[in-house]
Amino acid sequence: MKKYDIVIGKQFGIINGEKNIVFIKTGRGGTIEGFKNKYLNICDFLFKKYGYTFVVSANPKDSVCDLEEEIKSVDKYVGDYKEIYFVGISNGASIGAAQCSKIEKIKNAVLINAPLMINFHKIKEGAKKFRGNNMYFLYGEDDPSCRYIEILDSIKNTACKYKIIKGEGHDFSKESLIYELNYFLTG
């Protein structure tokens, strides 16, 4: 069975690579493995293709996330890197939208099914301040937030874009995640 190179408590799983970090923040209640090892399998597949360092961060139900602190806490385990690709799932996407602008090394973010009906003001404010190259909001066509997707047009930042993924709901399949992350990592 595949394993992370480093596991820090139940909070972080790391596959060590080179150059860049892909930092994945799971949805509320998400573990570093994900359902049926989804995150571990995705990281392993993409690591073999790109060789980047992958960090998966759990999202315990009753926790408050400080993304900057989380990244600092794994720095000593991942070595030197040029930039961070941030991937957020559901609540992890909301966290990314609200907090990525505070972290200079995050140049690109993909935010999957961030709930738009919960604290949208935080999503909007953070995304408006994002100084990176791209902040992609992805929504499954059957995700409850998809019907509100046009509210993202109120974010005045040319880096922010959104896309609807046909045939997906709130929980993207492993195959769809790999496809979208492949596209994201190759620009």
What are these regions (language model features)?
Residues V110-N119, G140:
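Active-site nucleophile loop of the alpha/beta-hydrolase fold
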Residues E168-I178:
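Catalytic histidine-centered segment of alpha/beta-hydrolase-like enzymes
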